[in-house]
Amino acid sequence: MHTKEEKMAAFSRLLDVQDRLRLQCPWDKKQTFESLRPNTIEETFELCDALMKRDYKDIKKELGDVLEHVMFYSIIGREDGEFDICDVCNQEADKLMFRHPFINWKEEGNWTVSNPDMYINDAGQVVYKETDEAETGKAEAANTEETRKAETANLEETLALGASKPKNAASVEKTWEQIKQQEKDGNERVLSGVP
């Protein structure tokens, strides 16, 4: 496949393309979190379809579309002075390292965490520093975990109910058409300057 350097160069190239589009493309200039949301939903559905078909060509294409949305939202976050793609990547890396305490992060390489409330202990585990902020962070992490478990249970229940009801192609197509219409309406509002 590709070397780490090639991957970094490709990511950097995509960042440059996305930044230029935001500056010079009339459609890209007008996009907001709200206007992009229907497109993100559609791209996510298309990725799921490709995954279900195990169509690697389409999976690669749809992953690119979803990645574009992650980068686009990060550009908007940067413009709002809140976060950028670096913050997104670092937060995700910190979260993954924290959620995998059985991995010794001191064993190979020079691993670090970007969150100032966290550090890698002598056992190689990512842990929170013992501060009031860290306690808040741990509480938020626990609340997030509980919320995620509850949402997963609700989703599983919903899917189980849906599985017991036969769905026909017409109802699926109708739902898909409604999503496409919402996207079209949102794009028309953005292009006309209506919020």
Where is each model-derived feature located?
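Flexible "arm" and connector segments at domain edges
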Residues: 1-62, 68-195
